[in-house]
A protein has these predicted regions:
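Residue-level signal for functionally critical sites in structured catalytic/ligand-binding pockets
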Residues: 35-42, 48, 103-107, 118, ...
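...with weaker cross-activation on analogous glycine-rich loops/strands in unrelated enzymes
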Residues: 61-136
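Glycine-rich, aromatic-bearing surface loops/beta-hairpins
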Residues: 121-177
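Residue-level marker of positions within ordered structural domains that often coincide
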Residues: 20, 44-45, 111, 125, ...
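Generic preference for flexible, low-structure residues
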Residues: 27, 31, 56, 60, ...
């Protein structure tokens, strides 16, 4: 497998372009539980250009009804990215606020039910990151440049994207916009 560096600029540019709109290449899951992780996955794909088409446990989108749980589900997105096994697709580590960069992801528990419910992408951060100067873009409560401090969360976790693995013989089509 080949390592693919994460193109943070491409991920953030995609986030800015589609924060208040919907890319017609992807279904809008807003009325089916929310579109935040679908949007986060689109941003991540814009920055890596690779998917993992393993049924059930991969990370991919083909159509509205042919996608992995990790493409649209908050906990499955986390599980896929932080899995320690080396496999095709992007990977990340859970980190703290001081380690995040634009293009990384945040997961928030908003409902107080002990489950993470929301996945924004970080688009900007201050020199010393804080809840006031880490700014995010998201769907399901569409936002761009929204400070983390403005969310009424009960728990938060950060996902620092390290890159992706891709098979050298299978370059995938890359269409960030």
């Amino acid at each position: 497998m080949n390592f693919v560096p994460y193109n943070r600029r491409a991920a953030v540019a995609y986030a800015h372009r589609w924060a208040y709109d919907r890319n017609p290449r992807f279904y809008n899951y807003e009325n089916l539980g929310g579109d935040c992780t679908n949007f986060a996955s689109q941003c991540l794909y814009a920055g890596t250009g690779t998917m993992n088409f393993t049924p059930t446990f991969g990370w991919y989108y083909k159509t509205a009804n042919d996608k992995s749980p990790s493409w649209t589900g908050v906990p499955y997105f986390y599980n896929f990215l932080t899995d320690k096994d080396i496999r095709i697709g992007p990977f990340a580590i859970e980190s703290d606020i001081l380690s995040v960069l634009p293009g990384d992801f945040v997961q928030l528990e908003l409902t107080g039910d002990d489950t993470f419910d929301h996945t924004p992408i970080i688009v900007e951060r201050g020199e010393v990151p804080s809840l006031d100067n880490v700014l995010v873009a998201a769907h399901s409560q569409d936002a761009d440049y929204r400070p983390l401090s403005s969310y009424p969360f009960t728990r938060i976790r950060y996902l620092h994207v390290l890159g992706a693995w891709r098979l050298p013989s299978r370059p995938e089509p890359f269409w960030p916009f």
